[in-house]
Amino acid sequence: MAEQHGKTLVPQIRFAGFTDPWEQRKLGDELEFLRNNTLSRAELSESEGTAFDIHYGDVLIKYGSVLNLEKAKVPRIMDSAIADRQTCDRLQDGDVIIADTAEDSAVGKCTELCNSKGKMVFSGLHTMPLRPMGEYASGYLGHYLNSSTFHSQLLPLMQGIKVISISRSAMADTTMTVPSVDEQRQIGAFFDRLDSLITLHQCKYCGVASWMLGVALVRLGSESDGAFGEMKHVLR
């Protein structure tokens, strides 16, 4: 919750030591729209090629609010000649990639690039790449633009029935809430730690689930009747 004071907001819950109000600004005044390419999934590879290409399907399903290029598996442009011919903008740390098309209201989900370390990275099919024109703390934009507070603005702006999309002009007219850079840094770090904790518990859950499934299969396989018993007999 936050109290409105003209064009500023004062959050009721925040990190200790911060008292300045949060400013409200138009997205189009803060972020510059870059050029993407339209390469299909068939032109990408999981291992071949040197230029990375961020596909909208991965933004929607695979990537979190922050895309760490050193850790994430990002597809590459398979044909180096095609990669060399790209006229779209090369991405850098802090750029935000938004999925502008989806089959549901997930349209607008984004990821913020980090740890690109000079690698050639492009924004691919059905994406909307943006670059901050001013200083923003790492991780803040990715987490904020994925928040329900911001995403609720996009719902009435979405177009289509079977395939839903949002335009650049509509995105540019949305309103962002912008704290000081120091407070952004605290917010980004907090959600990064939270994401890491969630991932850790998901890994633990998957490990326990796999172990339980293995135990169940062993028990079923030990029975003389049924498909598992027959399978065990065949494997012997």
Regions found by a protein language model. Give the residues of each.
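Histone-fold recognition with a strong bias for associated Lys/Arg-rich disordered tails
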Residues: 7-8, 94, 172-173, 186, ...
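Non-catalytic DNA-recognition/assembly elements of restriction-modification systems
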Residues: 13-38, 43, 226-236
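A short glycine-rich beta-alpha junction/loop motif
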Residues: 4-11, 41, 120-127, 158-185
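Extended intrinsically disordered, low-complexity coil regions enriched in Ser, Thr, Gly, Ala
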Residues: 23, 198-213, 221
